[in-house]
């Protein structure tokens, strides 16, 4: 399904009830499962990734297909590794089976896990023979994915000797690790995080009742719309004292012309004339916001140098290349620097204006949602495979229409072939 998008006839206006946090939902489902599901989670995110996690944790079959859900692949690998007497093969999409997982598997093996590679060494599918994990002292490069760290931490209290985890090579997405430890604390588990060493002693989780907060990553797309339109938008469901590192979106967008102010439990977004002339950011702790910020900067004509993006190459797609290629369709010449940064100093290139702009999403939900607001500047912009947003934000298009955008279902290939 491809969407042709047209902007509101008037200034965008409305209050958005944001979806619940996917990151928190996936963690609390694992934590609750480790208590024997004796706690009560009021609601979880209603997106594909969390649905995959729910299904995998409830089924008893010996094969689990997690589709394109990278978080589920990593968390469930650790979870199933410590289910004695159960053997599970976990697989996913072709892209998922080309995303490396050796660092996590090696770490789990050091903890006593029995895991085999079904096809290619270092990549899913995995055949996991559940057993009691011993734990102990291990070292893990933390520069690739914080989800490896979180997967180990959530299972650590139930390991025979607990876990002393030394992180090397620089820690990416640190707020996600802190989120995991914070949620473990909610379930009664203590930990110590000193310098680059995390220690979790053997202990039991305590069942709790838990309410998941709204998703700050989802909020970022409304900040983008506010920045590009100077509309009148409000966001409901966010937490003031959030565990989510992406709550920094409010700080990032102050330099992009958006101020934020709480009114009770609603975050009001307000236009500001203050634009930072050149944006310089380290987004190593908020990589999921990178696409939104990069596209916003480009559309506002603000040169930028954004670092800390090394993990974007192993996301749903190679997001560095995808951003560079799709922004070039809009005339922006973006440079990838050392596979860790994106830079734009104002260079533009000619574009063919004889046909609609078609944005490829590469089966990446964040590509679709980061580029859709560009329709404010380019009416008739086409987003290919628009339904990919169900991975994290199924209501996205409905919410976009609720503030005046128009979406028309089209076939991008047919349109381009008829020109």
Predicted regions and their residues:
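Structural preference for solvent-exposed beta-strand-turn elements
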Residues: 1-419
């Amino acid at each position: 399904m491809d969407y042709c998008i047209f902007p509101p006839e008037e200034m965008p206006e409305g209050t958005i009830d944001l979806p619940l946090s996917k990151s928190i939902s996936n963690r609390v489902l694992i934590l609750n499962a480790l208590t024997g599901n004796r706690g009560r989670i009021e609601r979880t995110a209603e997106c594909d990734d969390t649905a995959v996690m729910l299904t995998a944790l409830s089924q008893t079959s010996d094969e689990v297909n997690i589709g394109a859900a990278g978080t589920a692949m990593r968390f469930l690998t650790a979870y199933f590794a410590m289910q004695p007497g159960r053997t599970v093969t976990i697989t996913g999409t072709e892209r998922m089976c080309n995303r490396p997982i050796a660092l996590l598997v090696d770490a789990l093996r050091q903890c006593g896990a029995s895991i085999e590679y079904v096809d290619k060494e270092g990549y899913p599918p995995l055949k996991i023979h559940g057993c009691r994990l011993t734990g102990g002292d291990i070292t893990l490069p933390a520069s690739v994915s914080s989800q490896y760290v979180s997967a180990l931490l959530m299972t650590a209290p139930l390991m025979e000797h607990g876990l002393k985890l030394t992180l090397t090579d620089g820690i990416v997405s640190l707020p996600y690790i802190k989120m995991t430890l914070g949620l473990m604390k909610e379930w009664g588990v203590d930990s110590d995080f000193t310098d680059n060493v995390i220690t979790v002693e053997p202990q039991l989780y305590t069942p709790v009742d838990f309410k998941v907060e709204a998703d700050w990553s989802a909020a970022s797309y409304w900040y983008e719309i506010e920045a590009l339109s100077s509309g009148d938008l409000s966001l409901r469901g966010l937490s003031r004292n959030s565990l989510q590192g992406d709550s920094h979106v409010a700080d990032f967008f102050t330099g992009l012309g958006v101020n934020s102010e709480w009114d009770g439990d609603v975050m009001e977004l307000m236009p500001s004339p203050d634009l930072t002339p050149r944006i310089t950011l380290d987004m190593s702790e908020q990589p999921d916001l990178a696409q939104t910020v990069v596209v916003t900067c480009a559309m506002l004509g603000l040169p930028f140098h954004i670092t800390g993006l090394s993990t974007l190459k192993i996301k749903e797609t190679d997001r560095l290349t995808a951003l560079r290629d799709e922004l070039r369709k809009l005339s922006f010449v973006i440079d990838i620097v050392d596979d860790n940064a994106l830079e734009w100093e104002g260079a533009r290139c000619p574009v063919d204006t004889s046909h609609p702009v078609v944005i490829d999403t590469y089966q990446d939900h964040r590509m679709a949602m980061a580029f859709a607001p560009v329709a404010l500047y380019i009416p008739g912009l086409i987003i290919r495979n628009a339904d990919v947003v169900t991975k994290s934000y199924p209501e996205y298009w409905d919410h976009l229409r609720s503030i005046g955008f128009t979406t028309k279902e089209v076939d991008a290939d047919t349109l381009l072939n008829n020109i």
